[in-house]
Amino acid sequence: MLKPSSLPSPLAVPGLLRSFLGVRLPLPATYRKYSLTAPCPTCSVTRPSPKCWQPLSRRQFSKSPTILLHLSDTPEKPQNSSSTLEQSHQQEELKPDPDRDSNDSSSKPAEMVSPMGPKSKAEFTGSRSARATGGKAGRASKSDKLDAPQKLEPWQIQKQALKKKFPEGWNPRKRLHPDTLDVIRHLHQQDPKKYTTPFLAQEYKVSPEAIRRILKSKWQPSEEVIAERRERWERRHKRIWNQLAEIGVRPQRSKFADFSDTRILYGSRRTASSK
């Protein structure tokens, strides 16, 4: 709505603006012929016109006697009036129309909800489901490959067999010398209360179960087994000391070498013969 202060004088106001303001003045005959602008559509509803008014050309506008009369009365206001008319039209165009905005807003959601047709939407959903199923199939195939039993190497098979055979790890039992076994039996027979199973196990650093089996066993080796065992242990003794001699280790001298039977029996004769 235009402000009254910005309006020109009533003589310079055209018919269109007067119809907006509701002012109806008697117009001259020449004014009907040379009208400034065509009537507004809103005004045509209230005051229908018999014919559609066309805007005046520049030549007709300059030769109109009524307009010349108004220009002579107000020489400085024609430019202002034309500028105010243009500004009023621009303001009317720039004013937001609530009906038009509501129509636009009501139509936009429908467009946004269904931006694509049924065919494109079906294709989109189909491609999306295909991608999802393809990803699931790929993941399933990877999991199947991981779950499938792989071919083991020979060393892996041996390792699994050892783990199954020795779940607690490699812990071989301590093997005692046959003479030691005889000593254990002899001590237990001499004094069972003193040389008990826990005491003997702690003394020889074996388990009580091993001492119990040694005492329970009544097996005695034959002469042939004793001779074979003695040879085997002598070979083992020589092999070990030969390996130590190669790296520069000398054999340890026994603490009781001076009290051996040979020295006691034949030591005096050797000393006497030597003198």
UniProtKB/Swiss-Prot annotation:
Bias type Basic and acidic residues, positions: 89-103, 141-150
Region named Disordered: 71-154
First and last residues of the transit peptide: 1-42
Coiled-coil portions: none
Signal peptide: none
Biased composition (Polar residues): 77-88
Cellular compartments annotated: Mitochondrion
PANTHER family cross-referenced by the UniProt entry: NEUGRIN (PTHR13475:SF3)
Protein name, entry field: Required for respiratory growth protein 9, mitochondrial
